[in-house]
């Protein structure tokens, strides 16, 4: 009996989405041959809501291993809005269930991050056959040691830090580099260590601006004419850590320095140390381009494992890597949870041993 398998990509794009789609498809065709049909849901959950999907053929999955982005398109559809009926009077959950039924799907694979997994769990609870695949450059999905897209983003952010070193040294500047990661600092921590940042500021560890400035001044006294500060976009100071998120975000907006801490840190460092300070924001560059060799392998592992789950009809789960082994977690166990950098993380110990300031 034929199985009809839906695939969607949701949330922010990242390297490895197409490689994972390919891994799923090639493994399904290899294992099930003509007994599988693949349906592409376009533009994430938006396509599932609006009934926007297309029949896929084996040809659609050729030549996409190295391709960045996603051939299915993606869109952010916040989980908090899934049960909210807006001006268009569309019941989103009912609409998604209808599309699933209209497309005659036997199961749906959802590739995405934390928000995607929350909606995937919701659909699973509503009775749909769902399998998740963990995608995010933030590496913050609970229950898996790594997500596809993360290692490529580390490579990109590291190259930015590498290149900033030469201009910082040439101009005797402090350079603040803003790295993606709103709730978790994995990307900043890894790229900061790999790129030789002198100060690394993470969302999990509220910083004291005086300690940041002291670290810059210590380097200057030891003969260094520049410093590199890697700042996670979700970094906050000790005062903000005591406040509700919406309150400190509003306070930042009122100050006219943007919603991230980077500009304010740069301004304070220049004022307190007297050293010329600049900000570099690589932004969406960290999401773009071809996946690294590591992410291609990981995506293929995850995709082929998801195909196995389809074949054995194991639903309500998401793929994970735990202690070097590809496995699965129940969606209900991981949805709505964030994998943060723990205080006991070995890389934090490494950073401290190396004299890196953590704020």
Write out the residue ranges for each language-model feature:
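A cross-family phosphate/adenosyl-ligand binding-site feature
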Residues: 1-9, 20-104, 115, 237-242, ...
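Glycine/threonine-rich beta-strand-loop-alpha-helix active-site module
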Residues: 25-58, 126-163
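Accessory alpha-helical/coil subdomains and C-terminal extensions
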Residues: 99, 110-112, 120-122, 129, ...
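Short, ordered loop/turn segments at secondary-structure junctions
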Residues: 10-13, 41-46, 76-77, 113-116, ...
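Short glycine/serine/threonine-rich phosphate/pyrophosphate-binding segments
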Residues: 14-24, 48-49, 93-94, 105-121, ...
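Alpha-helix capping and helix-loop boundary segments enriched in small/acidic/polar residues
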Residues: 12-15, 87, 114, 144-152, ...
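Flexible loop/turn connectors
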Residues: 302-311
């Amino acid at each position: 009996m034929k199985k009809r398998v839906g695939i969607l990509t949701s949330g922010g794009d990242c390297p490895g989405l197409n490689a994972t789609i390919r891994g799923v498809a090639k493994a399904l065709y290899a294992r099930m041959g003509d007994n599988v049909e693949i349906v592409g849901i376009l533009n994430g959950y938006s396509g599932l809501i609006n009934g926007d999907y297309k029949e896929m053929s084996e040809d659609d999955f050729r030549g996409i291993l190295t391709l960045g982005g996603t051939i299915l398109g993606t869109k952010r559809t916040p989980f908090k809005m899934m049960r909210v009926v807006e001006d268009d009077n569309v019941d989103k959950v009912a609409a998604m269930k209808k599309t699933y039924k209209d497309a005659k799907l036997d199961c749906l694979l959802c590739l995405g991050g934390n928000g995607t997994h929350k909606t995937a769990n919701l659909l699973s609870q509503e009775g749909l056959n769902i399998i998740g695949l963990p995608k995010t450059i933030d590496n913050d999905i609970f229950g898996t040691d790594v997500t596809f897209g993360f290692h490529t983003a580390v490579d990109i952010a590291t190259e930015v830090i590498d290149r900033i070193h030469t201009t910082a040294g040439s101009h005797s500047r402090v350079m603040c580099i803003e790295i993606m990661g709103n709730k978790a600092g994995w990307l900043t921590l890894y790229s900061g260590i790999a790129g030789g940042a002198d100060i690394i500021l993470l969302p999990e560890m509220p910083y004291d601006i005086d300690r940041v400035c002291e670290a810059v001044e210590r380097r200057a006294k030891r003969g260094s004419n520049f410093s590199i500060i890697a700042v996670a976009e979700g970094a906050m100071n000790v005062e903000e850590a005591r406040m509700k998120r919406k309150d400190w975000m509003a306070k930042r907006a009122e100050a006219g320095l943007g919603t991230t801490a980077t500009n304010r840190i740069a301004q304070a460092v220049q004022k307190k140390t007297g050293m010329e300070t600049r900000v570099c924001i690589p932004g969406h560059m960290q999401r773009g381009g071809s996946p690294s060799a590591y992410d291609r392998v990981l995506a293929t592992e995850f995709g082929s494992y998801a195909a196995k789950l389809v074949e054995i009809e194991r639903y309500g789960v998401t793929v994970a890597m735990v202690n070097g082994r590809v496995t699965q977690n129940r969606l209900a166990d991981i949805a709505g949870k964030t994998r943060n950098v723990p205080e006991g993380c070995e890389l934090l110990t490494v950073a401290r041993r190396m004299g890196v300031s953590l704020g």
